[in-house]
Amino acid sequence: MIVKCPICDGTGKKVVKYKTCPVCEGTGFIDEFSPKQHMKRVSKRATYDLDYGEIPCPKCKGTGKVPVYAKCDFCGGSGKVVKCDRCGAIIGKYPDFKDRTLCDKCLKEEEERKKGLRNVYVFDELATFYDVEPGKFYKGVVTRIEKYGAFINLNEQVRGLLRPRDMISLRLENLNVGDEIIVQAIDVRPEKREIDFKYIPLTTYDLVKYEKEVPLSQIKDISQNLVEMRDQVVHIRGEVVQIVQTPGPTVFTITDGTDFAWVAALEIAGLRAHPDVKVGDIVDVIGRVTIRDGRLQIERIKLQKLEGDEAEEIRKKIEEEIDRRAEPAKDIPFLVKSEVLERLRPKMADVAKRIRKAVLDGRPIIIRHHADTDGYCGGIALEKAILPIIDKFAIDVDAIWHFFKRRPSKAPFYELEDVTKDLVFSIEDALKFGQKLPLIVLIDNGSTDEDIPAISKAKAYGIEVIVIDHHFPGEVVDGKVEVDDYVDAHVNPYLVGGDSNLTAGVLGTEIARMINPDVEDEIKHIPGIAVVGDHAKGEEAEQYVKIALDRLNELSKKYGKGRTYDREYLEKIALCMDFEAFYLRFMDGKGIVDDILATNIKEFGRHEELIDILYEQAMKMVERQMKAVIPALKTEFLENGIILNTLDVEKYAHKFTFPAPGKTTGFAHDYIVQKYGEDKPIITLSYGPDFGVVRATDAVHEKYNFNLNLIVEQLMEEIPEASLDGGGHECAGSLKFVEGLRDKVIGRFIEIIKNMKPKEQ
C-alpha cells in the first residue's frame, strides 16, 4: 500500500539548517507604529492605554531565523512510501516500489507457501479447447446435470463432462446448476470439442488467471487455412462493409483489404448486436473460426469499434492493400493496333481499376447500357469480366446476384427515370441488407449534356459514376468536356482526338480484358459484332470484324454445326440482338443475351440455332414494315448535291412493334443507300408527332461537315419554345420536341440541310 512518508509527513522535504531572516535581518520585527494615530474621531480617554507597538516579521514569524530545506532522503522527495500489505513494514520509496505489495520477508514466506499449493486456472473468454492441458486443474461452473454426469463450463466456449465415476468424495446429486467447482482435465479432444474431467477435493490451491494473447492475423491467411484453423481463436481488424440482421445473430461483413470475413454476434436472437457499429466503421474483432456455406465466419468473442488515429491508420492500410490488389492489367496489348486506343489507355486503366476496387471494397456495381447491339455488347463484356472477380472475392455466396446488376436503358442517354430506379433499389438494399451504395458504370451513353441531370442526382448521394461512351460529347477543351465536371472517370475516343467508330462494345471489351484477362476467349469476338451493329467504319473496325469471324468459325467447328461465316453473319447477330432487345425492354436478358452474342462458348450450337430462329422472325417483321414504309418514303435531290429522304413514321409505319422508329429509319436509309451508292451524300429523316430520327452516310459528314449534334444545338437556340433536345453520333441520332411545333422544327432542319455547302477541295 502507498502511505505518507513518516519522516517528512508527506511534504517530500526536510530542514537541514537555519539562517538569518532576510526580511527583518534577525530582529523578528519589521516596523513600529502608534495605534493612537490610527484612531481618529475617537476620544482621548478611549486611546489612553494605546502605546507604541511593533509588527512581527511575516517571513520568520518573529523568530529572526528561517529554515533551509532539502529533499527528503527517505521518500526521495515524493512524500510517499510503499508499505507491505501483510505486515505493514516499509518496503521503499514511491514510485520505485509502487508495484510491490509484500516486503522481502513476507514475499519469501508467500513463495514457500505456494510451493505446497496446486495451481488452479481460471480461463478468460478467449481460451479454447486447444488451451486445456491434461492433468491441470481448472475452475468452472456447472451448467447442466444429466444422469450420466455434469457438464462443466470453463468459459462460454469450453465445456467438458464430469462423470460420477470420476468423482472423489462428491456425489452427482450434491451438484446444482450454477455451482462453482474445481476439476482436473484427464482427457482432452479439442478436434471433437470434448473434455473429460475428474474431481479431486483441494483444500489449498492458488488461483491463476489464464489470459490468452491472440496475435493479429490477416483474413486472407485465415481463409487459406480454413479447415486447419477451425475452432481456433483469431484476432482481426478491418472495415465493416455490410451489416445483416438475421433471425439469429447480427452478421457483420468485414474486410482488412486482403479478403472478407463474416463476423456473427449474438446477444438476443433477432436483436441487433453492437448498435453503435455502422457500415464504414473500423472494428477490432476477436472470435472463434467457423465455416458457413464453405466460407469463413468468425463467432464473435469481442468486438470493439475503433476511433481516432488508430482507426485512421487501419483505414489507410486497408485502402493501400485494396489499391494494390485493384491494379488492372493496364499494359495488356489491345486486340488490334490503334493509336486512339493507346492514347485512351490511361483512362481505360483508371476505369478498370475503379471497377476492381469497387468489388474488393464490397460495393455493388450497376452497369447501365443503351438497349441496342452496341450497348449490349459493351455491357456483356464488362459483365463477363466482373462476375468471376465478384465470385472470387465475394462477401457472400450469392454475391453475383446481390452485388451486380446490368440494366438496359431505352433512351440513348441516362434518363432521370433510370437513375431514380437505380437510387431507389440501391437505397433499399442499403437499408435492408446493409450494403454500401453502388458504383454506376454507364456504357454507350453518359457523355452528353443530356446525361448530366441524372448523373448529378446520383452524385448527390455520393455515388461514384463512370462513363464509357463513344457518342459525340460536345466541345472538347484540354481533353475535357462538360460532363467531366460530374463524373469520376470518363472514357470516350473524342477526348483524345478519335471518333465514334471505336464503339462502346470495343471500349467495353478492351476494358474488360484489363479487369480480368482470363475472359478474353469468351469476349474477343464481341467488338466485331458491335462495330457491324453500329455501322462503324475504319481500319480498327475491320480488324475487329476479322477477329470475330475467326473466333466464331473456330467455335462453330469445335462446339457447333461446323459452319463458315462471313460479315453477313455478324449483321445477322446484330439484327437478332436488336430484335430481342425490343422485347426485353428493361430486362437484362441474362442467359438469352449470352446465347445471342455467343459468349456461352460450350453452347455455341444453341447460339447458331437461336440466331436462325430469331433472324427469320426479325426479317419477317422488317419486310412487313418495309412494305408499308418504302412507298411512303419521299426522296428529294437537293441543289447542293445531297439526297434527302423523309418519312412520316406516324402515318406510314406499324406502331408498337419491331422494328421501332429508329430501326425503321435505319432500314429505309439502307434501302436508299443500296439504290444510289454509299459514296453519295444521303440523309434520311423520319418523324413522328414529337420526335425525329436521322441517318446519314459518311459522305455527308466528309463533304459537308454534317454533324447532327451541332444542328440540334442550332435548333435549340433558334426555336427555344420547342423544348428541343437530342443528338447522338455525327451521322445518326434523334430529335425530341413539343408536338405543336413539329412542322417548324422539321421545316427548319430541312432548311439547314438545303443550305449546306460542300467543303472546298
Swiss-Prot record:
S1 motif domain residues: 135-200
Keywords recorded for this protein, A-Z: Metal-binding, Zinc, Zinc-finger
Zinc finger (CR-type): 1-84
Alphabetized PROSITE patterns for the sequence: S1, ZF_CR
SMART domains in the cross-refs: S1
Organism encoding this protein: Methanocaldococcus jannaschii (strain ATCC 43067 / DSM 2661 / JAL-1 / JCM 10045 / NBRC 100440) (Methanococcus jannaschii)
Keyword Zinc: yes
InterPro entries: DDH_dom (IPR001667), DHH_sf (IPR038763), HSP_DnaJ_Cys-rich_dom (IPR001305), HSP_DnaJ_Cys-rich_dom_sf (IPR036410), NA-bd_OB-fold (IPR012340), NA-bd_OB_tRNA (IPR004365), S1_domain (IPR003029)
Protein name: Uncharacterized protein MJ1198
Gene3D superfamilies attached to this UniProt entry: 3.90.1640.30, 6.20.20.10, Nucleic acid-binding proteins
Tree of life domain: Archaea
One term of GO molecular function: zinc ion binding
Lineage, uppermost ranks: Archaea, Methanobacteriati, Methanobacteriota, Methanomada group, Methanococci
Record has Zinc-finger as a keyword: yes
SUPFAM superfamilies reported in the protein's UniProt record: DHH phosphoesterases, DnaJ/Hsp40 cysteine-rich domain, Nucleic acid-binding proteins
